[in-house]
């Protein structure tokens, strides 16, 4: 059960999330892996989660009718949000807003087939008061098995 050096799913997700629109991260996505990227901004954490779930489903990163896939994605999203929000998933209640780029990557990072597929969610952007200029950078990463 070795983690393959060329198959670091979290690193791939982070590089995709960090890349600007006009940048293309130098990545070689392994054959059979799936990913999507997008942007989301809100004072409502439920909208942030919903936007990422919708992107993953509409880009066929996860299957819409398989509960364990949605469940794994949800936990990876929440773990990444913990990083962005420093463990406090509240946004609107404490007058905070986020503007984030995200990447969701699905693949097999281990060399053993029995380890199965994993999903990684990376978030990068800003968090702060809902006043332009009153924010700072933040980053989060969540990885979960499917």
UniProtKB/Swiss-Prot annotation:
GO molecular function annotations of the record: mRNA binding
Alphabetical list of Gene3D superfamilies matching this protein: Hut operon regulatory protein HutP
GO biological process per UniProt: L-histidine metabolic process; positive regulation of gene expression
Disulphide bridges: none
Transmembrane segments: none
InterPro entries: Regulatory_HutP, Regulatory_HutP_bacillales, Regulatory_HutP_sf
Keywords: Activator, Histidine metabolism, RNA-binding, Transcription, Transcription regulation
Pfam families named in the record: HutP (PF09021)
Record bears the keyword Transcription regulation: yes
Cited function: Antiterminator that binds to cis-acting regulatory sequences on the mRNA in the presence of histidine, thereby suppressing transcription termination and activating the hut operon for histidine utilization.
Cited HAMAP family: HutP
Quaternary data: Homohexamer.
The family this protein is said to belong to: Belongs to the HutP family.
Identification of the protein by name: Hut operon positive regulatory protein
Species this chain originates from: Bacillus cereus (strain AH820)
